[in-house]
Regions:
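Compositionally biased, intrinsically disordered or flexible polar/acidic segments
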Residues: 1-178
Length: 178
């Protein structure tokens, strides 16, 4: 278990491992992250956090208290065993997030674009019938959009684009990610 960032994550998201070796299980499954709409790095599927048999998996995650706001929440799952599946119900702060989630070795994600969170967040994965295997999770992502202050006016954007175009002969590459 290690931190994942750029270049392993092309969007330079920061993926931090959940520090609990008791429930961590390595996986040799090849999950194709290109099959996911938001392209998680393949490395996040190398380890799963697995519950005890017939018990729910309870996580306090993220590890910090969140401000009361509307968040995007994405959770990622891939069975660690080939040709297997397990079914669970996913709760966030005691509210049902997803019912009868069928996790296979191919992997899947579930997400919400507007989920209200505040303070410490608890994720609970409860085994669901007819699953004989305990629930697991590989990764999660929570983020919020926030205002960045003054907006750029269209005329300013046009002026910058014109200025950049006028210096094109210099072959200067400009990066907006500084």
């Amino acid at each position: 278990m290690f931190n994942v960032r750029y270049p392993n994550d092309s969007f330079d998201r920061y993926w931090q491992p959940f520090l609990d070796n008791k429930h961590a299980v390595s996986s040799t499954q090849n999950v194709t992250s290109a099959d996911f709409w938001n392209l998680p790095p393949p490395d996040v599927f190398n380890t799963a956090f697995v519950a005890e048999q017939d018990a729910p998996l309870v996580l306090q995650w993220p590890p910090v208290a969140l401000q009361n706001d509307s968040y995007y929440v994405s959770l990622y799952f891939a069975d660690t065993l080939p040709d297997n599946s397990r079914t669970c119900d996913v709760y966030i702060n005691d509210y049902l997030f997803f019912k009868d989630l069928n996790v296979t070795s191919a992997g899947l994600s579930v997400f919400a674009t507007q989920w209200i969170l505040s303070g410490l967040t608890t994720i609970i994965l409860k085994p669901a019938s007819p699953s004989a295997l305990p629930p697991l999770i590989n990764a999660g992502k929570v983020f919020a959009l926030f205002p960045v202050g003054r907006l750029t006016y269209a005329r300013d954007g046009i002026a910058v684009a014109t200025l950049i175009a006028s210096y094109h002969f210099l072959s200067v590459e400009i990066s907006w990610q500084m």
